[in-house]
Amino acid sequence: MPSGPPGDTLMHRPSLTSQQPLSIFLSLVVAALLLLALPSSPTAQKTALHLDGTPADPFLAASGKPVVLVFVRTDCPISNRYAPLIQRISSQYGARVAFWLVYPSRMASAEKIRQHERDYGYKLPALRDPQHALVTQAQVRVTPEAAVFDANHRLLYHGRIDDLYVDFGRARPAATTHELDDAIQAALSGKTPPRNMPGVGCFIADLE
């Protein structure tokens, strides 16, 4: 059967030129959706810092070991009173547990921290947490508070070190419970950790 005139055939053929804007638009939409699906760049994430200013991950070097983060301030009286106990516990468990002091105050410079460690006899490594990356991860609110993570780096306990302080300025003659010590033993043995107990001390600035 004879075909129609060439002009009739051309009238029903899709125009490539008219399809181009739609194709470009769809390509841009797909590209935008793919970008939104990508995880945030690691450089944009909050991070703790070593005292030399380099990014720090206290869990990275502690593969297979529990991690203990103890949050302190250079100018918090209660935090400073706990220094001998913190140092003693870190020395007791240091071979089996990764211990870190964490300074969440933005005002705590590396030199202030080094001086604070000298003044209070600290021998354990320290980190700065001005962006509160570790504060958020550990769910702490005051200094001093501790966070204990098991060997798989799951948070087991966060809160007070012991119950020595009833309130700010009110202390017992001696502590009757020892949450940090109990939590570390739980992390090492696989037993049930103590219940999270709020700390008594100096509020971390952004959480006041």
State each model region's role.
Residues 1-22:
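N-terminal secretory signal peptides that target proteins for export/translocation
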Residues 25-37:
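Bacterial N-terminal signal peptides
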Residues 35-45:
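Bacterial Sec-dependent signal peptides at the C-terminal "C-region" and cleavage site
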Residues 47-67:
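A short beta-strand-turn-helix
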Residues 62-77, 184:
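Short active-site neighborhood of thiol/selenol oxidoreductases, capturing the structured segment around
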Residues 80-120, 128-137:
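Structural microenvironment flanking redox-active thiols in thiol-disulfide oxidoreductases
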Residues 117-158:
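Short, internal strand/loop/helix patches
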Residues 155-156, 160-208:
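Thiol-/selenol-based redox modules, centered on thioredoxin-like
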